[in-house]
Amino acid sequence: RLKKTVLIIALLISALGAFAQTKSWTADNGNGTFTNPLMYDEFSDPDILRVGDDYYLVGTTMHTVPGLVILHSRDLVNWENVAYCFDRFDFDDDAFSLKNGKEIYGQGIWAPCIRYHDGKFYIYSNVNGKGLQCFVSDKIEGPWKHINMEGRIYDLSVLFDDDGKIYAIHGYGEVKCTELKPDMSGPIEETERVIIPEGSAVGEGHHIYKIDGMYYLVSTDYAPNGRTLCSRSKSIWGPYETCVITADETFGYHASPMTKIRGRIMPDGYPVSITPPDPDKVNASNIHQGGIVSTPDGQWWALLMMDFHSLGRTVTLAPVTWKDGWPMLGLEGNLGRSPRTWLKPNTPYRDTEVPHAPYDRSDNFDGKTLARVWQWNHNPDDKMWSLTGGKLRLRTMPADQLMWARNTLTQRAIGPESITTVELDVKNLKDGDVCGLGNINVPCSWAGIVKDGKTLTLRWFEQLDNDTIDTPVTLPDNRIWLRFVGDFDNDKGHYAYSLDGKEFHQLGREMTLSYQLITFQGARMSLFAFNKLGKNGGYAEFDNFTVEEPKADRTGYIPFDKTFRIINVATGLPMHATPHGLMHDTAADNDSPQTRFRVIDRGNGKVILQCADGRYVFSSGFGLPGDVRLTNDINLAEEFMWQDYLNREFMLMSMRNHRYIGKSPTTGSPYSMDYTGADPARRNGAVLRWEE
């Protein structure tokens, strides 16, 4: 994919950055279907709640504030950021404010649980070293009352039971149940009991429900790959029986590149490396931790996260099919696997909700308050920043490097590809000031301006190789435009700069992007300003922050009105409609009408596949090799749900048996319609590519 990545980046760098609320990724395809992920950016440890016709989703925010992000939806597909639980950590501890060499990267607030009871919303979560926290509000928008419940209860789920008791389920491996006090002042003493013993293959990330008198506990395990389990019992105290309800669904994405470093936030120059991903490995790239929810008409859905390369963990939506009393993920003909693209949930707002993204990512800083998309890296010093004259002003404070710079403003990087640009005014910098656009991660990177005495230097820095490139620069009006170009599906990115906001030049080399367990977050686009000489300095002003997403508009990716060949990604060979009536592969140079196809739109994301010789593809049986046939009768044509990868790669899922069309790269058998899905490397024969 290297040549493809280079071409993508060459095209992206030529884009112009004018401020506008450009189209941003939404899972809603606008035709009655959705495509995972729900958000093409980070939203980890999701917990889902329905109140009437409204759905609420809460997620981990770790060390960034405002903390505990809350999204709202009316159709489970289109989400809007409506609130956070708190503006800043209120603990008297320097680590929460990145002060005096202390930090809480990846150890802030995480794994929340959201509940609604007697007219009040409750959100529970853990803070490392501080214990269990509870936030209570009459309205989802807040204000939220904070109660420090303390106690070692984490990765929990809470159930308000019919008898008035409140239970917290928690623990890893050995699962425990503890009763909580009604006033949320803490756990009830001596009520903790083990309900699932170690050795039951149950992990963490619990979500407890009571459905038709039965207790269901949805959890995840990482031994060795992420997967989702369900435990059920007639009593909250057990005994529980356990069943795996989904495993190995990666949608064709392999494990992430991972950072290796001894220690945490180490000085620049400390050895850092990135382990390349094994394309055949799953690790935690499959859908795993999350919860389930019902619609008013009785449908059930799961919202689970997956480790999504350098973007971090993101959320997926999967249909739930009840089988023998178990909430299995997936469709009737393919239980345990989930479609990347499927019909939207049957909610009252399914057909009326306008597709939209959770956030407005671009910002010209003209407002009186920061947009909700922004989060500070640790608690900010509110005396050292402001929104002034339509610009974000960051005053510099002492720091040795980006990861220790206070008042760094961040937002989640967005995939699959994005171009982040900001205008920077440096006229009020002082000696030793450093400011610019960066990626808060381990390893981190940045591009910006350094002031030494009266000299301004354009600097590119990458922590992975401790590499610095300095470029002397003259800024007649003290302005420069900085840009980050990210290809997050391929974990590549680079910086660029412009002196006029129009013509951009690459700065530094292309970088490998990774995920890691130090910040426990994916890539974060960051606006920063600090002083490297150990003192307070001047200030930098940022304006016209834009995020462009070239692949957010997916309307042109299904090749309607085209005639094309279909190449099997695993074999590299074209699909061939044989005279015998089967689908097979053929020589690479075969360009006969029997190797050319067209797709016909049947509405709601469904298509049929027609060969250029007039025949239609269908399955004559259960989908085994040899069942995929050709017919002249359009009424027999198989309806497929097109599953697109936004790069001409796709899969075709039968609407009849919920399996995928594919061909083994090793056995020599003809095409079948019995594939459960793609493997992480997309080499099992189920992933196809179209070419004109």
Task: Identify the residue ranges that each predicted region occupies.
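Bacterial N-terminal signal peptides that target proteins for export
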Residues: 1-7
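A residue-level detector for conformationally permissive "hinge/kink" positions
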Residues: 7-12, 230, 290, 382, ...
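Lectin-like carbohydrate-binding module/patch detector with strong preference for beta-trefoil
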Residues: 555-692
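Short hydrophobic interaction/assembly module
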Residues: 14, 86-92, 614-617
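Hydrophobic h-region of N-terminal signal peptides that target proteins for export
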Residues: 11-19
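Carbohydrate-active catalytic/glycan-binding domains of CAZyme proteins
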Residues: 20-557, 594-598, 637-641
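Alpha-helical interaction segments
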Residues: 9, 45-46, 69, 134, ...
